């Protein structure tokens, strides 16, 4: 049985700012862009969350909810340095570390010899050491797989630890709302609700075949998650999955024509980034991201499509049609194929 830990720093950017400037502690504060430049909240402390302020919210709206909110500019180098220190602590317990962002990661400690192999005690020690060394708090979840470990880390936030043992998996998952399942977004959650499925126990009543008919290949995944099954391994290689560029506009783009007019400059920036990548990557599926004025958003990609302007125009037209509202942010990108992995696989069978 695997032993997976998911570690998630509590309001990481805000925590670093409060650590470095104690005057910020105890008052509602956030890290993000200015309201005057249509900035967005990257994260906020728990005092701000009490007013309803949330990540990805416009700074202007956040200030309406909390007029006393102090918004500070992000200092990414400080966050990266803190992240490096945290990961150096992780590496003392295992080499199997999968970073998800600067402030969270999966650890596979199945073969760790620390604390006689107790994942719970390892997680406790990591939390203590991060608090002592960096003076910030982290939450952790321990479970037999990644899906449950991530849910567990959120169960007792902030500054908490939650453990789901193998014997507790079935009952824990049965009561879990389907909206908490990995990969279930707003649209899928709404469809499940229309089908009368709100908990994993109800989801278990559906056969694998019936779920595949309703949700395509994702139905197979739903069938497994409803039973607490997640075979994904912890990858300790943080290779890039995509490259993209996006822009938030000072004034909403009112219609599709306005959005299409912005495509050439976005593609120029994207192609510049692609040219800087090393030869172990190959651009694959193109995608577009559209965030509407009400902060709803959609991402659309297409296998087999080209990376020319016409291909992105078609994708943008389809994505815009999903909302049909003024647009505040446009993004374009491309999924990446890792040629290094393909090369290594080929080398398993050298020429005779």
Where are the regions a protein language model picked out?
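Gly/Gly-Pro- and Ser/Thr-rich, intrinsically disordered tail segments characteristic of DNA damage-repair
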Residues: 1-214, 220, 338-340, 345-352
């Amino acid at each position: 049985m695997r032993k997976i830990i998911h570690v998630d720093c509590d309001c990481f950017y805000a925590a670093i700012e409060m650590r470095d400037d104690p005057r910020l502690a105890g008052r509602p504060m956030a890290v993000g862009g200015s309201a005057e430049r249509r900035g967005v909240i990257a994260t906020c402390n728990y005092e701000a969350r009490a007013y309803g302020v949330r990540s990805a919210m416009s700074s202007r709206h956040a200030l309406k909810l909390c007029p006393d909110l102090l918004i500070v500019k992000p200092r990414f180098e400080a966050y990266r340095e803190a992240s490096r220190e945290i990961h150096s602590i992780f590496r003392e317990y295992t080499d199997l570390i999968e970073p998800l962002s600067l402030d969270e990661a999966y650890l596979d400690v199945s073969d760790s010899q620390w604390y006689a192999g107790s994942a719970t005690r390892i997680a406790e020690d990591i939390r203590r050491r991060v608090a002592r060394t960096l003076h910030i708090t982290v939450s952790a979840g321990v479970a037999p797989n990644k899906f449950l470990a991530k849910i567990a880390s959120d169960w007792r936030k902030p500054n908490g630890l939650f453990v789901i043992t193998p014997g507790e998996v079935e009952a824990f998952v049965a009561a879990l709302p389907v909206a908490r399942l990995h990969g279930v977004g707003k649209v899928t959650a709404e469809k499940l609700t229309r089908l009368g499925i709100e908990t994993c126990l109800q989801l278990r009543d559906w056969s694998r075949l019936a779920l595949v008919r309703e949700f395509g290949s994702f139905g197979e995944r739903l069938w497994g998650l409803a039973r607490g099954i997640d075979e994904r391994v912890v990858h300790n290689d943080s290779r890039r999955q995509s490259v993209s560029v996006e822009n938030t506009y000072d004034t909403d783009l009112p219609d599709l024509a306005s959005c299409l007019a912005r495509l050439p400059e976005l593609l120029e920036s994207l192609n510049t980034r692609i040219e800087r990548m090393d030869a172990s990557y190959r651009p694959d599926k193109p995608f577009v991201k559209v965030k509407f004025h009400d902060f709803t958003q959609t991402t659309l990609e297409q296998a087999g499509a080209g990376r020319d302007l016409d291909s992105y125009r078609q994708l943008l037209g389809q994505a815009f049609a999903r909302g049909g509202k003024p647009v505040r942010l446009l993004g374009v990108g491309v999924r990446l194929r890792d040629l290094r992995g393909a090369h290594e696989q080929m080398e398993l069978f050298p020429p005779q």
